[in-house]
């Protein structure tokens, strides 16, 4: 193996730059050439490849987003489109591709490997929705961003003695909502893993809190459930307490990565190069019990969600 390429795909996540830096510098240290692919699979199809060196990744570990840019590429599901991508990689002399992204990005990597391109996946998504790894790159930073926002919202919620319903990202995974809720002392956490929730029961919980002396309530709502505005109106009508909805949106994806995400991304990026040099392909890198692991991509994508029910139950007790 002489040359590898690296791309970021799908939604951006804080820490992607730290992972890029780790891959590039580890690869160069091992005597490999590195090419960056701009704008994910879409950029690959357009031949947007360029040579990278140590300087290319200087002063980026502290930056959010991705210096390689990112994009979604639904047309990559077409095999003829993927064959065109393989031809482009071959034309540049690329022996292997490192893909940083979520499950959709991993699926693209898996399909490329079936066409003869060695691929390795790094988990880059704030959603923490990849079951094979305890944490994904970007989750910790997004969590801290959410908690910081909740702290500010709680200030005004306390002043106005109102209910604040805060919708957070995570797609169909409730990890961000759960961890943010327990970290911020939320009165209620609503996640898709717990099934359809009872709006009337939520209202009773809020009223019970008021009877026990609580002057305000914070409700964390996962976007997999959604409907923050509608829920706030319902709560206000049934409880008689002023309620406001806040959808945090894309602020959760931005900002300088946390120290934890920088360390995680660096460890995962370095391991990706090592696995490639061992001749492996169609693998994904992750962390389990603080140990860096690699796993077959098919096995990883087939694993079921790992929602922490014990932590949810702790949050339920502490919120009363």
Curated annotation (Swiss-Prot):
Ranges in a coiled coil: none
Pathway: Carbohydrate degradation; glycolysis; D-glyceraldehyde 3-phosphate and glycerone phosphate from D-glucose: step 3/4
Reaction catalyzed: beta-D-fructose 6-phosphate + ATP = beta-D-fructose 1,6-bisphosphate + ADP + H(+)
Pfam assignment, any one: PFK
Cofactor: Mg(2+)
Protein name, entry field: ATP-dependent 6-phosphofructokinase
Quaternary state and interactors: Homotetramer.
Annotated compartments: Cytoplasm
